[in-house]
Amino acid sequence: PFAGFSHQTRQRDEEMLAYYTEDRIFETWERAERAGINTMITNNETPSVVQAVKEYLRTGGSLQWIAQIACRKKSNMFEAIDEAVNIGCCALYFHGGYVDERYRNKDEETIRAWCDHARSAGVAVGVAAHAPEAHLWVHSLDIADFHAVCFFNCGSLHNGKGHKFKLRDMGRAIECIRQIRKPCIAYKIMGAGRIDPGMAFEHAFGHIKPADVVNVGMYRGDKDDMVEENVAMVRDILSGS
């Protein structure tokens, strides 16, 4: 939501962008800290978001930053990796659209070079992808430290193939996560706002591996206390309440 990617409508995108000023982004991170969240994930390309991350980390923010890396605004992926590392990411993963393309072309050399470059900088490196097959291919190469697995094979907005949400995809994503013998970040577990949050959290934590986590976007324009409410739901689920 910080970058205006609602995965719903263009009007919704614009609403999110207008709402999330730098002050509101900072407030959301501060509320996440107080609620017990320890990590945030953002992209590396939206100027307002990148600037907010820089300022937050510069002023001692306690959340760890995992960067989703793309290179549409850089000359190559190595330059994008270096910038995120210099800003202060603790880990990074490559945008699913880039990994999907490497999988289609079975381009092991390129994705291995990206992973090696990031790891040489001292950060954990992972991959996202929109189809389980791409994740299983990368996993077979044993080159990533973790996987960011989308619950829906919805495609990438950046190539005009996004917004495809089918419930049948969820089972395949979960099966993929359970086959991958490395930590996974499950994302789009609510289908970009299409699934009730409580049901989505319960379903996700009931099926992912014990060391896995979830990544959810939070648009406080819909509900100001969304951060605290989400944390409370997850605590209840994990405690068996």
Predicted regions mapped to residue ranges:
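Histidine/lysine/aspartate-rich catalytic loop segments that bind and position anionic ligands
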Residues: 136-165
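Active-site-adjacent beta->alpha loops and helix N-cap segments on the catalytic face
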Residues: 44-60, 73-79, 98-114, 132-137, ...
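Glycine-enriched alpha-helix->loop->beta-strand junction motifs that scaffold or abut catalytic
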Residues: 36, 58-62, 86-91, 119-121, ...
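Glycine-rich phosphate-binding active-site loops on the catalytic face of alpha/beta enzymes
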Residues: 96-98, 146-156, 207-223
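Hydrophobic faces of well-ordered beta-strands that scaffold small-molecule active sites
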Residues: 1, 39-42, 63-69, 92-94, ...
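Active-site beta->alpha loop and helix N-cap motifs at the rims of alpha/beta catalytic domains
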Residues: 10-105
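Surface-exposed cleft-lining segments at the edges of enzyme active sites
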Residues: 93-107, 120-124, 157-162
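Structured C-terminal cap/extension of enzyme domains
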Residues: 4, 12-16, 22-30, 55-59, ...
